[in-house]
Amino acid sequence: MSIINVMWSGGSPYASVHKVHQQILSQASPGTPVKTWLLQHSAPACLRELGQVEALKLSSRFLKGRGIWALSRPWRNCFFRKALLKNDARQVLIDGLGVARVLLPALRTLPHVRAVVIFHGSTRLQCKDVRLLRQFSGEQLTLCAVSQTLADSISADLKLPVVTLSSMLNPHTFEQQLLPRDQARQQLGIPAGTHQVFGAVGRLVDSKGFDTLLSAFAKTLVNHPDRLLIIIGEGAMRAELEAQVKALGLQGKVLLPGYVDNVASLYRAFDWVLIPSRAEGLGLVVQEAVIAGVPILASDLPVFYEQLGEAGNYVAVGDESAWARAIEASDALSTTEVAARQHASLDPEHAWLRFRQACTTVLSGL
């Protein structure tokens, strides 16, 4: 009997979600076959480590079943029901609400198959979503969220229990891949002699707040022209952010290298990691920076406080002036001391053990 991990797609925009599912599935009982279905395309390497990965290459119209495509829903449900039976599925790990809308209808006639839906971020629940999720018993369907903050929010909306699966990276595995500072800077093309290097990692989308960060960073260059900001990631806002860099005269002071495949190994290139997000379900960047020993400036979101507590250095969400002041003030702080406090607060080793135990419980259906 196997576990089927169902995700929407592969590719760099989904990298953090793939990491979380990989970490969860790594805690499955030894010998349990794990198969991954990507509803659309691409197969990330981290999921291949767990077992067979299949890209189903289904169209969005077929999957979403809107308009005239609603007529195809019975066939879609039949397709997935047969596929689950063929693969002797015992459990289905479902990536968020979008995939749940596709998969759960097929499980109505398969009461022996358990489903675990993992919520990675805030989502707009429609009335039909609530009805769908309430059709299943607690024995067949488990709802999980990657942080306590997110679990509380979704549970309040659904009026259903949501298990907190506080996602945590394996600190030992992550630390082994980290490059030394000089080597990491060389790979990123950082000029020698740069006074301070600030790093930000994430998709180039509105919720990440990089537009606010650019405006704030520009203000700090008046007194510290030898600073550098690198924003690693790709997304729909690239053209807008590039135009902002040009308008603010930040050419050469801000680098937008796009998606970098080995970004997890490069954190020690930074003096500080900046996380100006407007909203986050978890924020794996927090964990990656802490394990790398790099101090963090982050938006004052509850999900970041959940991880860093009083050791966090927080800045008001979307407040350009506050971000400029915080970046300016960072020069007077001991990065070693700040990083040590944040590491002690997150306590990656014990957080990883708690996460492993929680995953084992969820996957076993206890």
Language model: regions and residue ranges:
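A short, active-site helix/loop in glycosyltransferases that binds the activated sugar's phosphate group
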Residues: 139-164, 169-174
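N-terminal strand-loop element at the rim of the active site
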Residues: 6-72
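Conserved acidic donor-binding segment of nucleotide-sugar-dependent glycosyltransferases
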Residues: 298, 313-321, 327-334
